[in-house]
Amino acid sequence: METKAIVVGVGPRAGLGGALCERLAREGLHVFVAGRTPEKVEALVAAIRNAGGRATGVAMDTTREQDVIALFDRAETDGEGVLDLVIYNAGNAAMGQLHDMEASFFEQVWRVGCLGGFLVGREAVRRMLPRGRGTVLFTGATASLRGKPNTTAFAAAKAGLRSLAQSMARAYGPQGIHVGHVVIDGGIAGDKIIKGIPQFAQAMGEDGLVSLTGLTDAYWYLYRQPKAAWTHELDLRPFKESF
């Protein structure tokens, strides 16, 4: 019987979502790749299958309740096996000063960063509770812990997601569901930074960004933890990062 995983918030292949999908597939899980852009989703699915892994692509909007429910319904009914791991990786690190900010901007950042996490977390728990086991992991950021002048909307969303994860862990941990929150305290060495803002990537250097391999190792470590020694929150940063 196969083990299934859902990764929500998959963008470029050389990003955290893509790296997580490829790592889980290499470990033998059937990965449901969920993202907004069909072309990126299908390209990643093809790469996983070409490497001998199992993957199913689902283009969806994590802020739409019906999309999230449909994703979980498909994961449960597509193939044999059980859904054992769900990762919520969606987020929009949009910057802006409060006095110039439209309410619609703040709401959209919150919807992706927090509301989507609620919808995904709720559906994961609903499907896992009858079995009394499963793992739900949320991707956090520096802004999960503290707000800065230009992170008003992003920090509010990420702090909300962190509180959601804490509430879920305390409510459902005793029922066998492991809920974890990963604080990524630094830039990620993926396409969004390396190709999107190359000057910043060059200034930080290879040792100044969090490696994708290191991140996927950490998520896999959390997933494989025994019940007698669960971690709820894990923070990761390059050794050069001040904190």
Q: How should each PLM-predicted stretch be described?
A:
Residues 39, 59-71, 103:
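The beta1-alpha1 cofactor-binding region of Rossmann-like NAD(H)/NADP(H)-dependent oxidoreductases
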Residues 121-122, 166:
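A short, exposed helix-loop element centered on a Lys and neighboring polar residues
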Residues 1-32:
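Canonical Rossmann dinucleotide-binding motif of NAD(H)/NADP(H)-dependent dehydrogenases/reductases
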Residues 68, 97-98, 105-107:
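Substrate-binding pocket helix/loop in short-chain dehydrogenase/reductase
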Residues 174-186, 199-243:
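C-terminal helical subdomain
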Residues 2-3, 53-54, 81-83, 97, ...:
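Active-site loop of short-chain dehydrogenase/reductase
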